[in-house]
C-alpha cells in the first residue's frame, strides 16, 4: 500500500510473534492500547470507536492474521504473460467457463511470491552476502550436486560454512533459511513424472484454478515454453445441505454410510449419478428425496 501511494516506510514494527518490537505487547491487544496511549501523549489521537468489519483469520486456528513487512523472493509474471496466454489457448477444457476463469485469474496476477518462512518444506537453496543473493554458476552447480547426493535436507542439516566449497568459505556468505512455496514444488511434478512429454489430462477440483493447474502451467512455460497438459477437466465439490464446505471442525460432514442406511445404497448411487459433475452438489435430504 505504501508503494502504491509513494509513501516512505521504515523498519518493520512487529516481531515474528506479532508483538511490537522490543516489547511483549501483542499487536491486537496490549499493543493497540500502547499505540493509542502514545498518540494521546503527543496530542495526535483523534477518535476511539468500535465497529464491526470483516478481517482475515487463519483457517486452522480461527485467530486474526497480522501483517508483517518482510523481504521475499518473487517471480515477475508479466514476463510470462504472452507465453502463458499462448499456451492456455491450446488447452482443451471440459467447460468454457473454466477457461475464462483460469485466464482471468492468471491475467490478474503480477507477482508470484516463492518464499515462505516455515520450518518444513523444500529449502530455498541460495546463499546471501550482506542480505543480497550471491549465487555464481559454479556455486549453483555445487549446491545442486549436494542435493542430488544427499537429498534436500542437507540444506537444513549443515551450517553455511559446511555447505560451501573451499573457494567460497570465510566470505561472510550465509544460507537462506526460507522454504519454497509448496505450489512451486507440486507445480513442477510434470518434470519428474513426464519430463518433456505432455500429460493427456489434468483432473482436479475447481479450487485448483488458483493452485495446481496454475502453478503447473507457469513452471512449465518458464522451463520450456509449453503447457504441461493437453486438457484440463474440472469438477465441482460435494457440499453440505446449506452449500457450505464440509469440515470436521464445523461438524457438518455427511457420511455416505449414514445416507445409505437411511435411503439405501441404490438411492445414494442414483442421486450422485444424476448430478452434473462440473457443478457443486448440496448433499442433503433434498437431493435424495428428489
Predicted region positions:
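A short-motif feature that recognizes glycine-rich, charge-decorated loops
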Residues: 17-31
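Phosphate/diphosphate-binding loops
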Residues: 30-55
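Amphipathic alpha-helical segments in well-structured domains
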Residues: 28, 32, 253-256
Amino acid at each position: 500500500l505504501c508503494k502504491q501511494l509513494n509513501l516512505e516506510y521504515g523498519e518493520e514494527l512487529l516481531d515474528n510473534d506479532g508483538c511490537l518490537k522490543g516489547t511483549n505487547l501483542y499487536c491486537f491487544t496490549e499493543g493497540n492500547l500502547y499505540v493509542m496511549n502514545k498518540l494521546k501523549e503527543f496530542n495526535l489521537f483523534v477518535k476511539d470507536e468500535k465497529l464491526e468489519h470483516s478481517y482475515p483469520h487463519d483457517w486452522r486456528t480461527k485467530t486474526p492474521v497480522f501483517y508483517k513487512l518482510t523481504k521475499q523472493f518473487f517471480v515477475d509474471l508479466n514476463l510470462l504473460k504472452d507465453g502463458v496466454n499462448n499456451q492456455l489457448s491450446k488447452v482443451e477444457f471440459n467447460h468454457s467457463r473454466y477457461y475464462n476463469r483460469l485466464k482471468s485469474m492468471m491475467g490478474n496476477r503480477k507477482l508470484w511470491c516463492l518464499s515462505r518462512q516455515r520450518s518444513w518444506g523444500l529449502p530455498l537453496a541460495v546463499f546471501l552476502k550482506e542480505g543480497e543473493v550471491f549465487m555464481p554458476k559454479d556455486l549453483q552447480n555445487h549446491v545442486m550436486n549436494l542435493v542430488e547426493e544427499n537429498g534436500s535436507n542437507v540444506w537444513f542439516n549443515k551450517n553455511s560454512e559446511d555447505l560451501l566449497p573451499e573457494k567460497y568459505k570465510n566470505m561472510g556468505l550465509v544460507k537462506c533459511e526460507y522454504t519454497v512455496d509448496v505450489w512451486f514444488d507440486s507445480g513442477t511434478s510434470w518434470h519428474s513424472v513426464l519430463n518433456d512429454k505432455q500429460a493427456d489430462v489434468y483432473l482436479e477440483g475447481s479450487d485448483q484454478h488458483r493452485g495446481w493447474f496454475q502453478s503447473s502451467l507457469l513452471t512449465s512455460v518458464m522451463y520450456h515454453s509449453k503447457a504441461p497438459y493437453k486438457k484440463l477437466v474440472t469438477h465441482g465439490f460435494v457440499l453440505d445441505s446449506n452449500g457450505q464446505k464440509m469440515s470436521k471442525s464445523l461438524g457438518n460432514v455427511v457420511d455416505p454410510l449414514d445416507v445409505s442406511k437411511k435411503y439405501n445404497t441404490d438411492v445414494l448411487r442414483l442421486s450422485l449419478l444424476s448430478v452434473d459433475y462440473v457443478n457443486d452438489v448440496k448433499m442433503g435430504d433434498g437431493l435424495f428425496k428428489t
